[in-house]
């Protein structure tokens, strides 16, 4: 498939310069392609959107490296390859309505918002929730609804969802989340096995049963309970 990578004359009202320039972003996109990311919608969206706005200014020069970056509060901004891969998996279900558990910086939320009809996203850490809300508002992501809450409870008022995406690793999936999947819907999550290894996993709802498929090894921060103001 051909992915249109923007040239350096393309403009973005929040584009960067130097290590945050379009040329630097395009280099990241080529690396993602080389590492197996194929969905052109994902690649073009990630080429366009300003990842450097989702980290502290001191780390902005590293925003287009294929690496995770710290957000504070024991959380990280996921490696771009992981964001791309998880977004690809979300899109295979052709969803209209997506629930994200773990807003974090809001970057994954933004990529989803550009590609699906509506996104609901929950964050348990108040400071991260507030920063993500400000960034997403600035970028015009008006199809996103945010909540400061324990993500393990989901967002039942807006259920059911075509896809639920967890951005932290669970050892046991909260039954409340599974109950909020539409029939035929999918949950994409890093799950821990009995040996402590993490696997990116697809869980598909078929009536009252849930089919699990392990995809690949990953490394995420743990899914925690409770709310931090």
Curated annotation (Swiss-Prot):
The active site is at 78. Keywords: Cytoplasm, Methyltransferase, S-adenosyl-L-methionine, Transferase. It comes from the Bacteria. The keyword Cytoplasm applies. Gene3D superfamilies: Vaccinia Virus protein VP39. One of its GO terms (biological process) is protein repair. InterPro entries: PCMT, SAM-dependent_MTases_sf. It catalyses: [protein]-L-isoaspartate + S-adenosyl-L-methionine = [protein]-L-isoaspartate alpha-methyl ester + S-adenosyl-L-homocysteine. NCBIfam families: pimt, PRK00312.1. Catalyzes the methyl esterification of L-isoaspartyl residues in peptides and proteins that result from spontaneous decomposition of normal L-aspartyl and L-asparaginyl residues. It plays a role in the repair and/or degradation of damaged proteins. This is Protein-L-isoaspartate O-methyltransferase. It comes from Chromohalobacter salexigens (strain ATCC BAA-138 / DSM 3043 / CIP 106854 / NCIMB 13768 / 1H11).
């Amino acid at each position: 498939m051909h992915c249109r990578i923007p040239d350096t004359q393309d403009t973005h009202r929040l584009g960067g310069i130097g290590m945050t320039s379009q040329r630097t972003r395009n280099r990241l996109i080529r690396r993602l392609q080389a590492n197996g990311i194929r969905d052109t919608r994902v690649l073009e969206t990630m080429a366009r959107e300003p990842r450097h706005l989702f980290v502290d200014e001191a780390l902005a020069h590293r925003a287009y490296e294929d690496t995770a970056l710290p957000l504070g509060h024991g959380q990280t901004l996921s490696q771009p390859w992981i964001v791309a891969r998880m977004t690809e998996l979300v899109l295979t279900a052709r969803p209209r309505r997506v629930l994200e558990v773990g807003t974090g910086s809001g970057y994954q939320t933004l990529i989803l918002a550009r590609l699906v009809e509506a996104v609901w996203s929950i964050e348990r850490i108040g400071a991260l929730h507030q920063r993500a809300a400000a960034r997403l508002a600035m970028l015009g992501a008006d199809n996103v609804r945010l909540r400061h809450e324990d993500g393990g409870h989901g967002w039942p008022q807006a259920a059911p969802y075509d896809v639920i995406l967890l951005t932290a690793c669970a050892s046991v999936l909260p039954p409340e989340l599974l109950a909020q999947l539409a029939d035929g819907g999918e949950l994409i999550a890093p799950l821990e096995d009995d040996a402590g290894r993490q696997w990116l996993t697809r869980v598909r709802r078929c009536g009252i049963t849930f089919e699990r498929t392990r995809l690949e090894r990953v490394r995420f921060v743990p899914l925690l309970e409770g709310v931090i103001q």
